[in-house]
A protein has these predicted regions:
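Short glycine/serine/threonine-biased micro-segments
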Residues: 4, 18, 26, 92, ...
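Ferredoxin-reductase
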Residues: 1-26, 181
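Short beta-strand segments
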Residues: 8-12, 90, 149-151
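Gly/Ser/Thr-enriched, mixed-charge loops and adjacent short helices
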Residues: 19-140
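Glycine-rich nucleotide phosphate-binding loop and flanking beta-alpha elements
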Residues: 14-15, 95, 154-156
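Acidic, glycine-rich loop-and-beta core segments that form the ion-binding/anion-interacting portion
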Residues: 128-182
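Short, ordered loop/turn segments at secondary-structure junctions
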Residues: 11-12, 28, 36, 116-117, ...
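Structural motif
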Residues: 4-7, 22, 86, 110-112, ...
Length: 182
């Protein structure tokens, strides 16, 4: 809304020590490949860098309305009524911990979360979309309609049905296309 670009430091679906950088354009979309290559070339050319630490790193600010605006946008993208649904979410101790439960709850679902206590080093650690075993077990043992497993930065999702079976991306696309057709 008010920014020309954005940068996310993320391990995505990797361990915390494999952080990388994701760049976004002014629309919040992934930056165009041509521009990314230009940025990478510029960064590769920097050889005489002084590393900074502590108070010298930079400026931190919190965009107070950012989370609310983002969650409203998510609900606009998929305006569904989830009333009566019981959803179990594996949040991978990642970024979905601040949005998933509240967003799904506001759409009417009853939501329970696991891997919902990030501490900076437990992201994706034997949980989330790369390790859905606990979610699968809880789906078989519990009374849930659907299980959702995110990766650390919540840009990947796998689903688990009430029998604990994984639903791959093809099946998720099938569900989405049926919904859009109806």
């Amino acid at each position: 809304e008010r920014f020309d670009c954005g940068i996310m430091v993320s391990a995505s679906h990797n361990p915390y020590y494999d952080n990388g950088i994701k760049c976004f354009n002014h629309n919040g979309e992934k930056m165009e490949e041509e521009l990314l290559l230009e940025v990478e070339k510029y960064m590769d050319g920097l050889t005489d860098l002084d590393l900074v630490t502590g108070d010298h790193i930079g400026e931190y600010f919190e965009w107070e309305d950012g989370l609310e605006i983002y969650m409203s946008w998510l609900k606009e993208c998929v305006p569904v009524d989830l009333s009566g649904m019981k959803i179990l979410c594996d949040l991978a101790n990642g970024s979905a911990t601040s949005t998933a439960v509240e967003t799904l709850d506001s759409l009417g679902a009853t939501v329970e979360a696991i891997s919902n206590s990030p501490n900076g080093i437990n992201i994706n650690n034997k949980c989330g979309s790369t390790h859905p075993e606990a979610l699968q077990r809880m789906m078989r043992e519990g009374d849930y309609d659907i299980g959702l497993a995110f990766d650390g930065d919540a840009d990947r999702l796998i689903m688990v049905n009430s029998d604990g079976e994984l639903c791959d991306g093809d099946y998720i696309l099938y569900i989405c296309s049926r919904y859009m057709k109806s």
